[in-house]
Amino acid sequence: MHAQGFLCSKHAMSEPIRLIVGLGNPGPDYETTRHNAGFWLADRLADDLRATFALEKGFMGMVAKARFEGENVLLLKPITYMNRSGQAVGALARFYKLAPEQVLVLHDELDLLPGQVKMKQGGGHAGHNGLKDIQAALGTPNFWRLRLGIGHPRTLNLAQQVADFVLHPPRRDEQAEIDTVIDRCRAVVPALLRGDFAQATRQLHTA
């Protein structure tokens, strides 16, 4: 797989997504925690694309290489822990000469309830350390994000602090809602890989 295979025509209406990044923390202690929602979706997308994650130490992450309609697509799960996710994203994007607009980051979102999801390009990081580090590594906030709602302890009537909340598993009803959202996201990814962001947005936000 050669880096130049990921370059897209400058005449394209929109740059299709070529790197999908799931955010989370590595290791069995974190597998089921809310902060790993991005990993959960990345795993399902790898299954959908018939790709397998393998450790690539040079990119500081688990990388899956897929093909979609004749084009190369990368999936990444950084193993740097959440706060240093940008190290892996930046290394992979630079090697394959990907523009920030070709990067889609999947992450947990405190400001959305379980069962809610929003997609956007650019914007702030709202205190999410993974997004903050990626923004610093890419030198811009102009990458795409799929924000997977996990709720906030305050809105869910829990006494936990946020740092504790995100490192615990969702309750059963919350997990069911998150799983439903993951399936909705899986359905729109083909449009994102074609560069049809308008269709993906309509499909995701009207489901």
Curated annotation (Swiss-Prot):
GO molecular function, one term: tRNA binding
Record's keyword terms, sorted: Cytoplasm, Hydrolase, RNA-binding, tRNA-binding
Reactions performed catalytically: an N-acyl-L-alpha-aminoacyl-tRNA + H2O = an N-acyl-L-amino acid + a tRNA + H(+)
Record-annotated site: Stabilizes the basic form of H active site to accept a proton: D108
Subcellular location per the Swiss-Prot or TrEMBL entry: Cytoplasm
PROSITE patterns (alphabetical): PEPT_TRNA_HYDROL_1, PEPT_TRNA_HYDROL_2
Sites annotated Discriminates between blocked and unblocked aminoacyl-tRNA: N25
Keyword tRNA-binding appears in the UniProt entry: yes
Function summary: Hydrolyzes ribosome-free peptidyl-tRNAs (with 1 or more amino acids incorporated), which drop off the ribosome during protein synthesis, or as a result of ribosome stalling.
Protein name: Peptidyl-tRNA hydrolase
Signal peptide feature range: none
Family, per entry: Belongs to the PTH family.
Location, primary (coarse class): cytoplasm
Cellular component GO terms, alphabetical: cytoplasm
Positions bound to tRNA: Y30, Y81, N83, N129
EC number assigned by the record: 3.1.1.29
InterPro entries to which the protein is assigned, alphabetical: Pept_tRNA_hydro, Pept_tRNA_hydro_CS, Pept_tRNA_hydro_sf
